[in-house]
Amino acid sequence: MRSDISLDEMAAELSRLADLSTAVPLPESEVVALEEVIGAPLPDEFRSFLLRFGRGVRPGPLLDLHWIVEETQQEREDFQEEPEVAAYPWEPFPVTRDDVRQLRRLAAEEADPTLWMDKPSPGTMFLCSHGCSWISMLAMNGEYAGTVWLTEMGWVKDMSWWPSAPWRDVEPSSRLHGGWSEPVPFLDWYTRWTRQIVSRHWRSRQPDFS
């Protein structure tokens, strides 16, 4: 699934929103090393982002690649202890169009637009932490490859999944979805979140005349 925004369009927008000098592109060798840790090729948009912008640009979100590696390695160790819940990035990502239609129905009914799974989702990799055990995961393959999903890593029996939408600025206690039901590809996800962060910073600097 491709983003509405292209990498060049994203660069143009980020040059207006953020400081592109803070972007440090990753060399190909480091991207390959990350893929070796993950055990699967990175989705095209995410891979291109790393090669062009590295971890990201300030004041937008910065990806913590060391955290991604550490969480991946720790999860592999956990799976050795609990093989019945093991799920790996190279396995098929299970979310289908029917699942997404279900999310839309739930949102229309003002219910939580979440998908229940009894274990971590195969076909995903760690992307970023939102604090505590709230984690955005990147779909690695399938028709929703490159989209970003949120879960609560409470290890591990009752896990729900939903499209990650951190730009909605909802507290973790509200499950960070705020009714959002549409899968969002990585470039769109990063751009929307950066817009929200920049807007919030701008509002915080405005004088209060009340």
Task: Describe the predicted segments one by one.
Residues 57-59, 63, 145, 149, ...:
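Polar low-complexity intrinsically disordered regions enriched in Ser/Thr and small residues
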Residues 178-210:
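Low-complexity, Gly/Ser/Thr/Pro-rich intrinsically disordered linker/tail segments
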